[in-house]
């Protein structure tokens, strides 16, 4: 309360003091502000100077850095150049080393060739020497042969003269008796000829009778053949009409022709080829190709028979060019349709076979195939673009014969491999047998040595066992059967030294030797 009262009493004085203090503070603040601005200007000038100095320093450093970078780049380029030159030098050095090794090998090979050349020259000199010796011997033999030939010619001349003289004598001696001998010889020749003529006459008569009978039989057979021919003609007409109108029968007839070609190819059904095999593709659709021909190395090729006879029959019997051209176009169209349908089957993607990339499309009628190829050669290429090869009975037979030869070669190779394996096994067996025989021979040798030692102990030496046993007989020992006399004699005649060799050989030793 006292303080508040004092404040109220001195209020005006306090306000005056405060106003004076405020003016003083404003003056002080202005002075401080001016001083601060001056210091700030000084600091800014110093900072600007330092910044300018630092910029100069940085520029100098950048210039130095640029110079150093250029020097460093030059050093890198020089280093790369030196490395490249070093690699080139290393490559050249390796090439030189390789050439040195090659030259060394060539030198060794040259030395080897030189040695072989020396050997060949030595052999040549030896052969030339032998040739000269043979030529000398041949010349001597030739001279001797010429001398022998001259002797033979002179002997031949003498024999010729003697033969002429002897022939004259024989001619004079035989002239008197030649007539009698001629008559006898003529009778000897004519009598068998007469008998042969009579026999021939009899054979002619028999043959005439036999031919008459056969002629009658032949007439009968010709009539039967005529009836059979008429029947076959009717059946051929019926078959042609049936084939024209029934696609199933056409297909069956094509399969029959295909079966004949397969039979003539040498391949065996059930071994090298199969017919009417049911297969399915990845989608589960089932297909039944006509024939699957197996190739070596577990490969297969599919043959599908396609019959196109209707248009070809019209082409064959056409009377005008327009009819023939129209039928030919239909025939080509039918073949192309068959090719297109066969290409869509994708036989090479069927499960269960590893087929080749192409299928053989079999055309049973050879003329129909030839007419189509001659009229449109592009038909073959179009078919091959769809992995189809067109074949006729002739070309298919050639292909199948080739496959048969492949199988023959494969079987020969298999047989050769089997023979080699069996030969190897036989050689092993023979080696084991020889080893056993060697062991048996060693055992027999040991047994023979043991036998020789036992026999030496038995019959050699003054105190051998047989001599001592025989002395018991002199002492009155009763025996049931005597020792064989040859052993007793050998024991009595044996030398005094022990282990003397025997004169005779044991039968076992004879067998071993």
Swiss-Prot record:
Compositional bias segments (type: Basic and acidic residues): 503-513
UniProt feature coiled coil, ranges: 36-250
Q: Which InterPro entries match?
A: DNA_recombination_RmuC (IPR003798)
Q: Which UniProt keywords apply?
A: Coiled coil, DNA recombination
**Keyword Coiled coil carried by entry:** yes
Keyword check for Isomerase, yes or no: no
Region: Disordered; residue ranges are: 490-513
**Membrane-crossing segments per the record:** none
One GO BP: DNA recombination
**Family designation:** Belongs to the RmuC family.
Its function, per the record, reads: Involved in DNA recombination.
- PANTHER family membership: DNA RECOMBINATION PROTEIN RMUC (PTHR30563:SF0)
Protein name (Swiss-Prot/TrEMBL): DNA recombination protein RmuC homolog
Q: Which organism is it from?
A: Vibrio cholerae serotype O1 (strain ATCC 39315 / El Tor Inaba N16961)
